[in-house]
Regions:
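Flexible phosphate-sensing "switch/lid" loops adjacent to ATP/NTP-binding sites
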Residues: 1-303, 313-330, 338, 345-351, ...
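Short acidic-aromatic active-site loops that bind/stabilize oxyanions
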Residues: 85-96, 335-342, 416, 420-422, ...
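A generic structural signal for well-ordered coil/turn residues at beta-strand boundaries
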Residues: 181, 208, 265, 327, ...
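C-terminal and late-domain segments of enzyme folds
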Residues: 418-422, 426-520
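Cysteine-nucleophile active-site neighborhood
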Residues: 3, 324-422, 428-430, 501, ...
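Acidic/polar loop patches that form or flank catalytic/metal-binding clefts of enzymes
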Residues: 246-249, 360-361, 379-387, 432, ...
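Structured core elements
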Residues: 13-16, 116, 149-150, 186, ...
C-alpha cells in the first residue's frame, strides 16, 4: 500500500506494532519469530520493518516500532518520573494514549502525508485489544483522517474446492466488536476473488464490493503493488482520505517486475545455516533479508535465484555430504549465534576455499571464515571463537571489550554493537571494487570481533582485511586475493539490511556476479 501511494506522489512512513511483552525483537530466537531486522539507529525490530524499508526505500527509526513491552515500559517510567502528576495510572486510557502519542511522534518526525500502521497478531486475540482501542480512539477523534484495512484469509479446502468467506465475515464482526468498521478488506487467497465472493463479503461486512481487494498468491512479492492497482486501491484510499494525487508512476517498478518474469537462466546458491527448521516445517523467514538481497542481486545479474537451505549440523554428522556444494554456483553463510552447527559451517567454508567456490560470509559467516583460515593456513591449531570455547588456545575471534561489562551485568537486550558504523576499504581489493566509494556505512549486530592480537599473523599468512573501522582497530571485511580465489569474502556487518529491488547491495551484486561465472 505504501508503494502505490508513493507512486501517486505522496510521502509515506510506516509503523509496526507487535503485541508481545518483549521490549524489542532482539532477544528472540529466529525460529521463534523470524529474522531480527536492525534499523540504522541500532534498534532491533520485527522482520516486517525490513519489508517496509525494501518496498518504500525508507530509513526507519525506533520511533516506527513498538511492542506491548515497550509501551508499558514507557508508561511505567513516566509514572516513576511523576509525569502523570499524581493521577492513578490505569491500563485504559493511559496505555492507548501512550500508543497514540508514539504514533503521532513518528508521523510528525517523518513529516509524511500518510502514516501506515500495522497492528500485528490476529483479530480476536487478547494481546492486541489495547492497540485496537488506541486505533478506535484515533478514528473517533478525527474520522476523516483515519481509515482501516482488514487483511483476511479465504481458504479453499482441498476436499471442497470452494473459496470460503466465513472466516472473513467472522473477522470483520470481531473487529466491529472493538468499535472499528473496516473501510477496506484485503482478501488473501490462493486464487483471485470472483465477483460473487466480493459481493458476499461486502453484504456481510457492511462495505462496498469495490472496497474488497483481491490479493491472490503471486509469483513474486513485488507483484503485490501492481496487483492492488488492478482494483484501483490507491484511488480509493486517496478519495477516502480526501487527498489529491500528484502523479501516477509505477512504471519503473512494473518494468523491473516484468524483467524478472522474463528471466530464463538461473544461479544456484546454497545457504548454509541452522535456523531453518521448526518442527516438521522449514522457516525461511529467519533469513528473509538475505533471501531478498540474493534475489535483488540475481535479478540485476539477469538470473533467477535458485536457493537451497542446508542445515550445517548435517555436515557434522556426515562430512561426505560436503561434495554436494560442488553443484552450486555460490555458497553463503549468514549470521548466527552459539555453538550448534559451527563445525559444520567451518567444514563448508574449508570446502569452498579449497574448491574455489564463490563464498560470502555474513557476521558469524565472516568470523568462522577467519577461524577456518587460522586453523588450516595460519597454523593456529584449535583456533576458535570464545563464544564457543572460552578456553581456546587461539581466540582469533573474541568478545569486544565493552561487551564484557554488559554480559557481566546480564544486560543482553539491546546491548550489542548495533546499527550503522563507518568503515574504510583497502585499495585494489574485491570489496573496494564492489562499492562506489572507499568509505562505507553498514549496519551491525554482534558482540564478537576478530581479535586484534592475531591480525598481523593472519595478514602474514595471506588473509586480506579489506575493510576496517576508521581507526583501523576493528576488522570489518576479510577476503582472499583474487589470484587465489574468484570470490571469498566475509563481512562483520549485515549488508542484507540495505538492499532493495531497485538498488541491490554492492556486495551481493559482486557475489552473484562471481557465482554466474563459475559455471562458465
Amino acid at each position: 500500500i505504501g508503494r502505490i501511494l508513493q507512486a501517486r506522489g505522496l510521502s509515506v512512513t510506516a509503523i509496526k506494532i507487535d503485541p508481545y511483552i518483549n521490549v524489542d525483537a532482539g532477544t528472540m530466537n529466529p525460529t521463534e519469530h523470524g529474522e531480527v531486522f536492525v534499523l540504522a539507529d541500532g534498534y532491533e525490530t520485527d522482520q516486517d520493518m525490513g519489508n517496509y524499508e525494501r518496498f518504500m526505500g525508507l530509513k526507519l527509526t525506533r520511533d516506527n516500532y513498538m511492542t506491548t513491552g515497550s509501551v508499558y515500559k514507557r508508561v511505567i517510567e513516566r509514572e516513576r518520573n511523576l509525569e502523570y502528576h499524581g493521577k492513578c495510572v490505569e491500563v485504559v486510557p493511559h496505555i492507548p494514549l501512550e500508543v497514540i502519542g508514539t504514533i503521532r511522534r513518528a508521523a510528525d518526525k517523518a513529516d509524511a502525508d500518510v502514516t501506515i500502521i500495522e497492528i500485528g497478531g490476529t483479530i480476536g486475540e487478547y494481546q492486541n485489544i489495547l492497540f485496537l482501542e488506541a486505533a478506535r480512539m484515533m478514528k473517533s477523534e478525527d474520522p476523516d483522517s483515519v481509515l482501516f484495512v482488514l487483511v483476511t484469509y479465504l481458504p479453499i479446502p482441498n476436499k471442497i474446492g470452494e473459496m470460503k468467506t466465513k472466516p472473513t465475515q467472522y473477522a470483520a464482526r470481531t473487529l466491529n466488536s472493538a468499535g472499528i468498521q473496516a473501510d477496506f478488506i484485503v482478501a488473501r487467497a490462493e486464487r483471485p476473488l470472483d465477483d460473487r465472493r466480493k459481493e458476499k463479503i461486502a453484504i456481510s461486512c457492511s462495505i462496498r464490493p469495490e472496497a474488497v481487494i483481491s490479493a491472490p498468491d503471486v509469483e513474486s512479492i513485488y507483484d503485490v503493488p501492481i496487483n492492488f492497482e488492478k482494483d484501483q486501491l490507491s484511488d480509493a484510499i486517496l478519495a477516502r482520505l480526501h487527498l489529491k494525487s500528484r502523479k501516477t508512476d509505477l512504471a519503473l517498478w512494473q518494468k523491473k517486475v516484468a524483467e524478472v518474469k522474463r528471466l530464463k537462466r538461473n544461479v544456484k546458491i546454497a545457504v548454509v545455516g541452522k535456523y531453518f527448521k521448526t518442527g516438521d516445517f522449514v522457516l525461511s523467514d529467519a533469513y528473509i533479508s538475505v533471501i531478498e538481497s540474493l534475489k535483488h542481486a540475481a535479478y540485476a545479474n539477469h538470473r533467477k535465484p535458485e536457493l537451497t537451505w542446508i542445515d550445517s549440523t548435517e555436515y557434522e554428522q556426515d562430512p561426505k555430504r560436503l561434495r554436494e556444494l560442488h553443484d552450486f554456483d555460490g555458497v553463503l553463510i549468514p549470521g548466527g549465534f552459539g555453538a550448534r552447527g559451527v563445525e559444520g559451517k567451518i567444514l563448508a567454508i574449508e570446502y569452498c576455499r579449497k574448491k574455489r567456490i564463490p563464498y560470502f560470509g555474513i557476521c558469524y559467516g565472516m568470523q568462522l571464515a577467519v577461524i577456518e583460515y587460522a586453523r588450516h593456513i595460519a597454523k593456529f591449531p584449535g583456533a576458535n571463537t570464545t563464544e564457543v570455547d572460552s578456553k581456546t588456545e587461539h581466540p582469533v575471534i573474541d568478545i569486544l571489550p565493552e561487551q564484557r561489562v554488559q554480559l557481566a551485568k546480564k544486560a543482553y537486550g539491546g546491548t550489542m554493537r548495533l546499527g550503522e558504523y563507518p568503515a574504510i576499504l583497502k585499495k585494489g581489493t574485491l570489496a573496494e571494487q564492489a562499492y562506489p566509494s572507499r568509505r562505507i556505512i553498514e549496519r551491525h549486530r554482534h558482540r564478537y570481533e576478530v581479535n586484534p592480537s592475531y591480525v598481523a599473523a593472519l595478514r602474514e599468512a595471506g588473509l586480506v582485511f579489506s575493510g576496517t573501522s576508521p581507526d583501523g582497530v576493528l576488522m570489518e571485511i576479510a577476503e582472499l586475493p583474487k589470484s587465489e580465489h574468484p570470490f571469498f569474502v566475509g563481512v562483520q556487518f549485515h549488508p542484507e539490511f540495505q538492499s532493495t529491488l531497485l538498488k541491490p547491495h554492492p556486495l551481493f551484486l559482486a557475489f552473484i556476479k562471481a557465482a554466474t561465472k563459475r559455471r562458465k
